[in-house]
């Protein structure tokens, strides 16, 4: 099985990301309108690090976008990495790509020097709550449009070792 995961670095790779996102925007738990999708693509290109996953035929089968730092701190809190979203083609969701992707994501985040990883998930999804609860703790909850989101946090070292005992630690420390 010839999976390959890259970090986007040029226009061709960014175009593949944008095309994949647009074609699969309805696969999110709360589907994106075209207008919202274009906004998230633009924001990802401007602020994010974009990983693309390819199958053995060179077709894009997944993407993950993360930022170094948080928007609340103008991305100056570089000890934090925020995973903005993960999108995997439905045919690959229960494959070994998840494990391969997890390792590659951990490697990419490790290269940033991050100490903490944060991400959000829909509070109503019992599946996501159980999955993410295995390696991260809920540190807050917020209303996002018409649904509630849990905000998760995990130490990078626990993320790499997939599930150490740390649960929480909502550090909202912005460098001055």
Task: List PLM regions with ranges.
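A conserved beta-strand-loop-helix scaffold within acyl/acetyltransferase catalytic domains
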Residues: 28-80
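C-terminal "cap" of GNAT-fold acetyltransferases
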Residues: 141-176
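Conserved acetyl-CoA-binding loop of GNAT-fold acetyltransferases
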Residues: 131-143
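Conserved acetyl-CoA-binding loop-helix of GNAT-fold acetyltransferases
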Residues: 88, 93-107
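Short amphipathic alpha-helix that is part of the acyltransferase structural core
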Residues: 1-36
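Short, high-confidence coil segments that cap the C-terminus of an alpha-helix
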Residues: 111-114
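Conserved acetyl-CoA binding element of GNAT-fold acetyltransferases
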Residues: 76-91
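Conserved beta-strand-loop-alpha-helix junction that forms the acyl-donor binding cleft
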Residues: 117-129, 133
